[in-house]
Amino acid sequence: MKFVDEAPISVEAGKGGNGALSFRKEKFVAKGGPDGGDGGDGGSVFLVADENLNTLIDYRFQPKYRAEDGEKGASKNCTGAKGDDLLLPVPVGTTVIDMDTEEVFGDLTEHGQRLKVAQGGFHGLGNTRFKSSTNRVPRKTTPGTEGEKRNLKLELKVLADVGMLGLPNAGKSSFIRAVSSAKPKVADYPFTTLVPNLGVVKVQQHRSFVIADIPGLIEGASEGAGLGVRFLKHLTRCRLLLHMVDMAPVDGSNPVDNVRVIANELQKFSPTLSNRDRWLLLNKIDLLPIDEVEARCAAVVKELEWTGPVFRVSALKHEGTAELSGKIMDHLEAIWEEERENPDARALELERQNQMAAEARERIEELREARRQARLAAGEDDDFNEDDYDVEVIYVNY
């Protein structure tokens, strides 16, 4: 299945049914009076979060949706049937943006959660409604109102507590395989990971967190190099970032430079995201000479002037991964406990997430516009959609 994490759609609620103009006509009943019924309300449009979905691909090929109109009223004071609501399933983690106002319309973060995105039109009134002591034969009715119309943009961001950062082949996917039951593809060539992978890390019976691995970044990613930075937006919901660096890179590069490359790209993408709690993971220490591990790891930390937590691991051999998982769990539980006890802390976190999401959208749109201008300058088709030529992948949420 193709992984699609953005889709523009247009939705239109149903029109309300018109009220009926009718008078009672019955044998032996003279001047029976008005009996025109009201119309039915138009159907509304709802988005419904579904945990069984993990892509927005269906909305890429079918972008227009309309709910049912309400039926018109009838004689004998019969009310028209209400139009059926239209329920559109979307993956959990979908953000809804009004494209006309560029405001966030809502966020679907729990299975079964509903969000009304277009209100159905109000029913029209039949002439029965207008009878009075001075108007026994009303001929007035009202039409049903139009349903709401909206142009929306759906953005899917995976729901994870912890996000992985690093260059291609740093060992991020191997780490997720080591600490969870997820089985992302692992190989000795760059860009093995093409879409976000999720894994659930169970520290104890009732203690667990979700970790996300995104495609690796390279220098210039913020300008579109490699797979670009489009997947960085999936980290905006994460409470902790794990910055993994290969301590024995096959290309002979300097681990310190590799850490700085990612930090620079993160800063360019979203300054708020770059200020997230970030732990440094020195991976592949099993490939270093035993007598050099201590000195080389210390040298990297010193040159970086790193003040945050540092961990030495071997994702392939599962060395240090269990201890790290426990410390991550403790860190997350402390955050969650603070937010339960302090509403201000929760409000501040939501503000940060909204700021990161806004910065991510702005940067991604800037890159798309730059690529569009480059295509126009080269005389290429302006209708080209880069997502139509994206890779075909299997995306599984474990």
Swiss-Prot record:
Q: What are the OBG-type G domain coordinates in residue numbering?
A: 160-333
What is one process in the GO biological process aspect for this record?
A: ribosome biogenesis
Q: InterPro entries given for it?
A: G_OBG, GTP-bd, GTP-bd_Obg/CgtA, GTP1-OBG_CS, GTP1_OBG_dom, GTP1_OBG_dom_sf, OBG_GTPase, P-loop_NTPase
> Where found in the cell?
Cytoplasm
Binding positions (Mg(2+)): 173, 193
Q: Where is the region Disordered?
A: 128-148
Question: What EC identifiers does the entry list?
Answer: 3.6.5.-
Query: Which residues bind GTP per the record?
Result: 166-173, 191-195, 213-216, 283-286, 314-316
Instruction: Report quaternary structure and partners.
Output: Monomer.
> What NCBIfam families does the record point to?
Obg_CgtA, PRK12297.1, PRK12299.1
Q: What is this protein called?
A: GTPase Obg
Q: Which gene holds the coding sequence for this protein?
A: obg
